[in-house]
């Protein structure tokens, strides 16, 4: 049985808004697995438990570059919020985004071998680490060069969106802002990844089973929950953030605009922040001193 620490309970509470005791019970049942505990709470408390599922812990920036119909969106990570605002780090991020758009590297390793002002990206990164005194990495990038129109939207430097479209640029820009705010996972319900659907279905089945309803009604509850989820996470089905009386699809149709694809990056999304156990560290130091 894994030890359930106060910091684990606090982290789960921050993610879910669930009562402390419920968080502790869920962690105990999940044997200390935070992700599993969050799922258990979602089953018990409903979707409120997922309100902060996208809250991130790692620091860094998202940078964008567009030149005509070619563009790139990149995420670079660092250790602290302070460094994410550093001028040298921001300038490096902007140059990396431009390099991705113009040179079309296959992956981060290939990107690292390209040059900025005659010096490799990797050497530039290493020099910047030495100058600033903090580790930083190029995490991911998306490149567009399909001949379609492009717009980007940056919410500060922590959320970045690129949209490929045909039609009205103002409408496409509105879609980019909408994506940053509502965080859809796909264009349409049909494109939602199967693993996400399976996860939602599993949660819905557990909730339906606990409801004690007859099998036929429970099955309808499950299907209803899944369909509701698909509408909530697919861009075209979402209520438009600037006018919730119409869906994004309806807004685009009225503007005679087609969105072909989009990329959304949220800084640190999916990265677990290291939690220091100072009590254990002190105990280890004391033990080492006693041995000495």
Curated annotation (Swiss-Prot):
Which Gene Ontology terms cover its molecular function? translation elongation factor activity
**Cell compartment(s), UniProt:** Cytoplasm
Report the principal subcellular site.
cytoplasm
Q: Where is this region: Involved in Mg(2+) ion dislocation from EF-Tu?
A: 80-83
Q: Name one Pfam family in it.
A: EF_TS
For this UniProt record, the keywords arranged alphabetically read as follows: Cytoplasm, Elongation factor, Protein biosynthesis
Record-linked InterPro entries: EF-Ts_dimer_sf, Transl_elong_EFTs/EF1B, Transl_elong_EFTs/EF1B_dimer, Transl_elong_Ts_CS, UBA-like_sf
Question: Which GO CC annotations does the UniProt entry carry?
Answer: cytoplasm
Q: Which family does it belong to?
A: Belongs to the EF-Ts family.
The record's annotation in PANTHER family points to:
ELONGATION FACTOR TS (PTHR11741), ELONGATION FACTOR TS, MITOCHONDRIAL (PTHR11741:SF0)
- Protein name as it appears in the record: Elongation factor Ts
Organism the protein comes from: Cupriavidus taiwanensis (strain DSM 17343 / BCRC 17206 / CCUG 44338 / CIP 107171 / LMG 19424 / R1) (Ralstonia taiwanensis (strain LMG 19424))
Gene designation per UniProt: tsf
């Amino acid at each position: 049985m894994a030890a359930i620490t106060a910091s684990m309970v606090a982290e789960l509470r921050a993610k879910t808004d669930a009562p402390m005791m419920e968080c502790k019970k869920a962690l105990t049942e999940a044997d200390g697995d935070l992700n599993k505990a969050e799922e258990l709470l979602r089953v018990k408390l409903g979707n409120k438990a997922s309100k902060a599922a996208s809250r991130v812990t790692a620091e860094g920036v998202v940078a964008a570059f567009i030149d005509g119909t070619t563009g790139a969106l990149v995420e670079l990570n660092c250790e602290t919020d302070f460094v994410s605002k550093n001028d040298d780090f921001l300038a490096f991020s902007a140059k990396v985004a431009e390099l991705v758009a113009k040179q079309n590297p296959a992956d981060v390793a290939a990107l690292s071998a390209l040059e900025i002002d005659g010096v490799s990206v990797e050497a530039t990164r290493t020099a910047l680490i030495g100058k600033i005194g903090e580790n930083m990495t190029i995490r991911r990038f998306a490149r567009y060069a399909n001949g379609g129109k492009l717009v980007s939207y940056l919410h500060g430097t922590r959320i970045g969106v690129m949209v490929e479209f045909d039609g009205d640029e103002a409408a496409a820009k509105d879609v980019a802002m909408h994506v940053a705010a509502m965080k859809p996972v796909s264009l349409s319900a049909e494109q939602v990844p199967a693993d996400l659907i399976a996860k939602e279905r599993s949660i819905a089945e557990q909730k339906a089973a606990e409801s004690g309803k007859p099998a036929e009604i429970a099955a309808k509850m499950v299907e209803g929950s899944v369909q509701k989820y698909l509408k909530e996470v697919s861009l075209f089905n979402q209520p438009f953030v600037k006018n919730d009386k119409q869906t994004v699809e309806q807004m685009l149709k009225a503007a005679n605009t087609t969105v072909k694809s989009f990329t959304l990056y949220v800084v640190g999304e999916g990265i677990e922040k290291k939690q220091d156990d100072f009590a254990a560290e002190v105990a280890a130091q004391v033990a080492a001193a006693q041995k000495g």
